[in-house]
Amino acid sequence: MPYVTVKMLEGRTEEQKKALAEKVTAAVSETTGAPEENIVVFIEEMSKNHYAVGGKRLSDK
């Protein structure tokens, strides 16, 4: 049973997250042969306060 975790900044719509889960599931099924009903997708959203690049939080830009 494949498990996929997608980490991304918050702010996507529910429709975007639904489409992401559907397309990731389809891609994993196609490439691994796993049935779609056995594929688990976790979407973890992060606040810009909790994400930094080059030592700078995205919320500080």
Curated annotation (Swiss-Prot):
What range does the record give for the signal peptide? none
Which residues span the membrane?
Answer: none
Would the keyword Isomerase turn up in this protein's UniProt record?
Answer: yes
- Tell me which residues this entry annotates as catalytic: P2 (proton acceptor)
Record carries keyword Isomerase: yes
* Enzyme Commission number(s) of this protein: 5.3.2.-
Q: At the top level of its lineage, which domain of life is listed?
A: Bacteria
Mind listing the UniProt keywords for this protein, alphabetically?
Answer: Isomerase
Q: What class of enzyme is it?
A: isomerase
Q: Which SUPFAM superfamilies match?
A: Tautomerase/MIF
Q: Name one GO molecular function term.
A: isomerase activity
* Entry's family note: Belongs to the 4-oxalocrotonate tautomerase family.
The protein in question is named Probable tautomerase BC_5378
Q: Which residues form a coiled coil?
A: none
